[in-house]
């Protein structure tokens, strides 16, 4: 989108960081809004480096200790957990598994596909993919519930909760309209936010959002391990975009 419409006013966001932050905050005994999460990465591909409370105390070392000692083995599910399938419960639990395997930083949940690639592939069913699972489950129940709400003209007692991502979008829009300059994790042009990563790459970092736009927080230099993983992922992404825009079979391959 940046390449095709460079002047477009847009924000690219994902609900996964805020979902995971709420789960972590609940485990630590805090409201998510009372914590400041330091984070860097790409969309669906990032790490938490620090978690500060309002006293300026970093809570990530304690979380790391709890993970390594076996005190915590998984994260609780999000607000509408009652309607989530086993995939999400396993995914949330794999956050802790990934953190234990690589304890420098806490990974975003989707890193399960990169940290545990062989294991995930062994569990993959070519005859019934994740997309098939959603179509056969979540999509049907959501449409059924929406139909019920329309027929009864009431959303009372509905199990469908806008939850984390819905509130996140509203909070972000409110920050823009009212120039609150609140902090959100957003996908933006790097432009030096991550000092040792391509400046023209889109990265996912904390930003202050207000009426005048988005101001990324300086992350600084990141470790070589995480940088290398990001470069491999970004290389694929850039080639995929170029293949699409140029109609190039070679780049797609």
Description of each model-found segment:
Residues 1-24:
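Rossmann-like NAD(P)(H) cofactor-binding subdomain of soluble oxidoreductases
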């Amino acid at each position: 989108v940046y390449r095709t419409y460079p002047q477009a006013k847009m924000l690219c966001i994902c609900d996964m960081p805020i979902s995971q932050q709420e789960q972590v905050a609940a485990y630590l005994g805090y409201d998510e809004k009372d914590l400041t999460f330091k984070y860097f990465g790409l969309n669906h591909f990032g790490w938490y480096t620090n978690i500060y409370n309002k006293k300026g105390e970093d809570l990530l070392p304690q979380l790391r200790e709890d993970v390594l000692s076996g005190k915590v083995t998984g994260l609780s599910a999000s607000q509408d957990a009652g309607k989530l399938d086993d995939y999400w419960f396993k995914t949330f639990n794999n956050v802790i598994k990934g953190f234990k395997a690589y304890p420098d930083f806490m990974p975003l949940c989707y890193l399960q596909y990169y940290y545990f690639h062989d294991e995930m592939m062994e569990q993959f069913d070519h005859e019934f993919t994740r997309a098939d699972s959603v179509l056969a489950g979540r999509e049907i129940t959501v449409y059924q519930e929406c139909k019920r709400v329309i027929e009864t003209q009431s959303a009372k007692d509905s199990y469908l909760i806008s939850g984390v991502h819905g509130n996140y979008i509203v909070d972000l829009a409110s920050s823009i309209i009212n120039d609150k300059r609140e902090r959100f994790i957003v996908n933006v042009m790097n432009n030096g936010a991550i000092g040792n990563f391509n400046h023209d790459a889109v990265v996912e970092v904390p930003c202050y959002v207000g009426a005048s736009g988005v101001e990324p927080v300086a992350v600084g230099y990141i470790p070589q391990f995480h940088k290398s993983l990001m470069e491999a992922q970004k290389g694929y992404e850039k080639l995929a975009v170029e293949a699409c825009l140029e109609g190039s079979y070679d780049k797609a391959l």
